[in-house]
């Protein structure tokens, strides 16, 4: 693409527009600058709310992939890629999902997480190669993230995923975007021009983070990773998380602290198993069998056998 064509394209992208409410921001004192930023941030939640129907469709697609043994793959460049990685890596400790069930890809690879990699976002071949390296298949769901909706790395990945017959989702902040037109599901949070023109790490990045939170969290709830609003599949891999696991067992069962510790010890720190043991009186093996029979849904396992 020539520079003239690129300039023309950028002029048509909502996230690249100038914000008339912040034209004087460089003349303002600190508090007034912060108030301008905060005023713009208030628009983000409403923009995400307006995209709720498409976010719902995205969750349903991800749940379908998980139920078929597939994966959730995030793909982006720069801030968008880092947000995908951030969401992906938190799924293992929060929900004890297997490594590789939720994956974040960033243009330029691991180096690009902390350093800018020149030209990476324009590399269409890399977008395809990164998915091929994962043995991406029709069981998986690809979420392409780009505030502008035009990033070549992401667009190429979405096109390849469609060739694989996988479900594709675009997360962007620009109506009628390139990636939105490629993807099966177009999640577009129309946050408007940024406080600083084109700095999409601001409102656009915040909107993307909220959307990714929804996609992963709702999907995990739908596959039985929670009980009530408790993280009962928490991986108690450090002292803080173990203390949280104890609290979760106590909150779910109304038991004493010592009872929670003992149950977790017998259950090898498996929170669901410990809760089921306390509430139903079964032993460790029976608790695991009940959970397996109900595909890991604690609520269903607790009601098993009741009439």
Curated annotation (Swiss-Prot):
It is an enzyme of class 4 (lyase). One of its GO terms (molecular function) is ether hydrolase activity. InterPro entries: Etherase_MurQ, Glucokinase_regulatory_CS, MURQ/GCKR, SIS_dom, SIS_dom_sf. GO terms for biological process: 1,6-anhydro-N-acetyl-beta-muramic acid catabolic process; amino sugar catabolic process; N-acetylmuramic acid catabolic process; peptidoglycan turnover. Pathway: Amino-sugar metabolism; 1,6-anhydro-N-acetylmuramate degradation; Amino-sugar metabolism; N-acetylmuramate degradation; Cell wall biogenesis; peptidoglycan recycling. PROSITE patterns: GCKR (PS01272), SIS (PS51464). Its EC number is 4.2.1.126. The keyword Cell membrane does not apply. Belongs to the GCKR-like family. MurNAc-6-P etherase subfamily. Specifically catalyzes the cleavage of the D-lactyl ether substituent of MurNAc 6-phosphate, producing GlcNAc 6-phosphate and D-lactate. Together with AnmK, is also required for the utilization of anhydro-N-acetylmuramic acid (anhMurNAc) either imported from the medium or derived from its own cell wall murein, and thus plays a role in cell wall recycling. This is N-acetylmuramic acid 6-phosphate etherase. It comes from Pseudoalteromonas atlantica (strain T6c / ATCC BAA-1087). The gene is murQ.
